[in-house]
Amino acid sequence: MTAPLVLAVPSKGRLQENAEAFFARAGLTLAKPRGVRDYRGTIAELDNVEIAYLSASEIASQLARGMVHLGVTGEDLIRESIVDADKRVALIDGLGFGSANVVVAVPQSWIDVRTMADLDDVTIGFRAQHNRRMRVATKYINLTRVFFASHGVVDYRIVESAGATEGAPAVGTAEMIVDITTTGATLAANGLKVLDDGVILRSQANLVASRDADWSNGARETARIILDHIAARARANQYREVRTRFTGCDTTLLAEAHDRFGVVSPFGGPTSSGMVTLHCPPDRLYALGSFLRQHGAETVSIASLDYVFDRENPLFVRLEAFLRP
């Protein structure tokens, strides 16, 4: 038996719950056969898969080392902890949870500082006045350096934060911060504001692939199946199934429906009796139903879709392209 594909997921909290729910919606049930406290698991519907429950930061590290094939972690951790990240890992799919921004935040009392250009002026003046560089508290050392350099800001020094970064200016350990935020409420509560152009990265949880993992034929096939489930669920979320039958339904009418409502005909045009199945974006359903009834349909039924499997899986195509020598 070949070595299993290793999929790393967060080991605790909301990220674990969201990751497990994401895979469950795709028809992949993450299970811990040896008990809830175990840090290894399986996918109930698949053989040749091992789930590794790790912290989000450990997942990024293990991806970089090639110790896991796929992992669920934030893009912020990937960009911060992996040098040349785009060469060593691939962001296969954004998962729609764990969203947060890495931002530059300064005291609200700095009323004349709104942009990185303003900050550059302030850091220069601060050094001239105090004979030392302005301090930036952060856990995101590499992201900070790259972003500040891209804006020409050089008169600062980083103070590595081990605790609540947003409190650093108030207690006097730094003049400003780079931190991650979801709503900005915590920053505001600590008297801080985000610079107008101070968003370093808009992050979310991603399914990430490691180039250096042992991508055997078995591992690739398992990855293909996992990604097929995910892509099918994502495509199903984009549409609702619309069915109707009436004699006035023809290819000309369907072409107009496509242009006006963004529908697709996954199984071709109407049958000789006018029976047709359409896939329609959710926000255009009522308009499409009205259109079809205006043209002769007596009944239009609408149903949710669980999965829509296409011949080509764009997620697996992305993985294969990344792994290609």
UniProtKB/Swiss-Prot annotation:
It is found in: Cytoplasm. It is an enzyme of class 2 (transferase). Keywords: Amino-acid biosynthesis, ATP-binding, Cytoplasm, Glycosyltransferase, Histidine biosynthesis, Magnesium, Metal-binding, Nucleotide-binding, Transferase. It comes from the Bacteria. Catalyzes the condensation of ATP and 5-phosphoribose 1-diphosphate to form N'-(5'-phosphoribosyl)-ATP (PR-ATP). Has a crucial role in the pathway because the rate of histidine biosynthesis seems to be controlled primarily by regulation of HisG enzymatic activity. Belongs to the ATP phosphoribosyltransferase family. Long subfamily. This is ATP phosphoribosyltransferase. It comes from Nitrobacter hamburgensis (strain DSM 10229 / NCIMB 13809 / X14). The lineage of its organism: Bacteria, Pseudomonadati, Pseudomonadota, Alphaproteobacteria, Hyphomicrobiales.
